[in-house]
């Protein structure tokens, strides 16, 4: 049960001093308004005292209102004054602390068990910049920032409709982090939004620093490696998903939006697909599918062919491969695993190292270590070439990077230990995992499977805009 505010101004200030007194950025200012003892409290790093005085107190001094005591002052500020105060009064200590930590200024009035909140937030923020993880040639070059309400405004600026709904909640974390559920109420299926809202409200974690923290709670099958949600740092991409009837989850402090639900085919799409010609976009999309297959099955297929089925390799190519393998001490499976692990270590080192030396780390690892390993006869040139090709292919579909790496290691192990049956088992397991994934009751492989007109309209390839506009594709309204 929340504790009500005290009637005494001194008692309310004593409570706040006990809670925040050791914080040097906690600001308290006693003042008299129309002869009534009051106090303004705020955090100087989150709110601006100058902004409060300019917006509220100066205006109040010019208003010749007959206030009639503390209660009259509170009612006047909430209902009659031109001062843009919050519409609801603060009545308990829990709400008082929450509003203060959210950057609002609070006016405490002596003799009244209510307080008035003012939106005077002035938080440090990063300016809107270009996306760093989703490169596009055309389209908007804006990216989300760490401020929740800025991100909501970016969505509303591009998605100008009265049906865009933004519901802000406080997560069950110690830090009381806010998150926002955005959707188009005219397009998003109500049962999907209700289910998503219920799952988000049930999440209880110590801290919420990223929208990705929600992802594991949205999956029905926790062992399924395919994601039930996608991520984007582009407001334009988020608006495109809203037009499809999907939901967007924004988290305060995170510049990435969570898109729910997510389908397999969407990982191979980008904004440039819809700004380019249909033929070129279809070609690029097919190349991405081939790159994903190469990233997952390429190294395992090489190990299986060299170790168990050399007869499927052309004679000239087999001769070259044999010359390379003769000089190496490791069997093909261990050789491929070691090179793949080395490339992942180099990638991780380049990613985590300081930006000033990250490129140097990548170049040293990729060129010097690779060349040294081949010259020393530890690994063969064909193995290094295949592993490097698979690593580059993985970058063509960055949103499935984690899945590509995990699947690649599994395929190498199964193909290296059991040959053709192992490779087939790995492929069937991955396919079964994709077919068995049903984010919020929808087919994860739609529109790729089952094959139909949707597969050619906006699946493996993209149709022309006139046909896309007529389809009006929205989740929950799939064609048979």
Describe the role of every protein-language-model region:
Residues 381-383, 388-480:
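Hydrophobic alpha-helical transmembrane segments of membrane transport and translocation systems
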Residues 249, 256, 262-411:
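Transmembrane alpha-helical segments that form the functional core of multipass membrane systems
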Residues 84, 105, 137, 166, ...:
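Functionally constrained cores in energy, signaling, and assembly domains
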Residues 137, 160, 368, 375, ...:
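Short glycine/serine/threonine-biased micro-segments
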Residues 1-297, 315, 435-480:
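Membrane-embedded alpha-helical signal segments
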């Amino acid at each position: 049960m929340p504790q009500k505010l005290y009637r005494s101004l001194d008692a309310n200030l004593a409570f706040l001093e006990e809670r925040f007194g050791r914080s040097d950025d906690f600001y308290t200012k006693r003042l008299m308004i129309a002869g009534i003892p009051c106090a303004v409290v705020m955090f100087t790093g989150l709110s601006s005292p100058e902004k409060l005085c300019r917006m509220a107190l100066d205006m109040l001094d010019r208003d010749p209102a007959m206030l009639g005591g503390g209660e009259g002052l509170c009612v006047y500020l909430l209902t009659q004054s031109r001062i843009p105060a919050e519409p609801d009064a603060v009545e308990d200590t829990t709400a008082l602390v929450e509003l203060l930590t959210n950057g609002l200024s609070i006016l405490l009035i002596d003799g009244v068990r209510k307080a008035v909140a003012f939106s005077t937030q002035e938080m440090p923020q990063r300016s809107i910049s270009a996306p760093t993880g989703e490169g596009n040639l055309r389209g908007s070059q804006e990216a989300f920032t760490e401020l929740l309400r800025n991100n909501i405004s970016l969505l509303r600026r591009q998605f100008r409709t009265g049906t865009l709904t933004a519901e802000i909640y406080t997560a069950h974390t110690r830090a009381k982090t806010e998150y926002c559920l955005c959707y188009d109420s005219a397009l998003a299926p109500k049962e999907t939004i209700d289910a998503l809202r219920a799952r988000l409200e049930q999440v209880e974690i110590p801290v919420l620093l990223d929208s990705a923290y929600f992802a594991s709670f949205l999956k029905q099958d926790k062992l399924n490696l395919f994601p039930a949600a996608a991520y984007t740092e582009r407001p334009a991409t988020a608006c495109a998903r809203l037009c499809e009837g999907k939901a967007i989850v924004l988290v305060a402090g995170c510049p990435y939006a969570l898109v729910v639900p997510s389908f397999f085919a969407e990982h191979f799409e980008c904004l440039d697909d819809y700004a380019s010609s249909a033929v070129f976009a279809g070609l690029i999309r097919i190349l991405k599918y081939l790159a994903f297959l190469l990233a997952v099955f390429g190294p395992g297929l090489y190990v299986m062919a060299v170790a168990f089925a050399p007869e499927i390799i052309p004679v000239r190519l087999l001769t070259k491969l044999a010359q390379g393998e003769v000089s190496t001490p490791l069997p093909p499976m261990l050789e491929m695993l070691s090179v793949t692990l080395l490339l992942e270590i180099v990638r991780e080192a380049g990613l985590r190292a300081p930006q000033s030396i990250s490129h140097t780390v990548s170049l040293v690892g990729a060129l010097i270590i690779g060349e040294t390993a081949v010259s020393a006869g530890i690994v063969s040139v064909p193995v290094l070439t295949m592993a490097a090709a698979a690593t580059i292919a993985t970058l063509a579909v960055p949103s499935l990077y984690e899945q590509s790496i995990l699947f690649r290691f599994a395929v190498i192990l199964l193909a290296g230990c059991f040959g053709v049956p192992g490779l087939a088992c790995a492929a069937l397991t991955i396919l079964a995992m994709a077919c068995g994934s049903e984010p919020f009751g929808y087919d994860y492989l739609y529109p790729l499977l089952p094959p139909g007109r949707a597969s050619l309209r906006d699946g493996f390839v993209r149709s022309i805009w006139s046909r896309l506009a007529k389809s009006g594709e929205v989740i929950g309204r799939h064609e048979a």
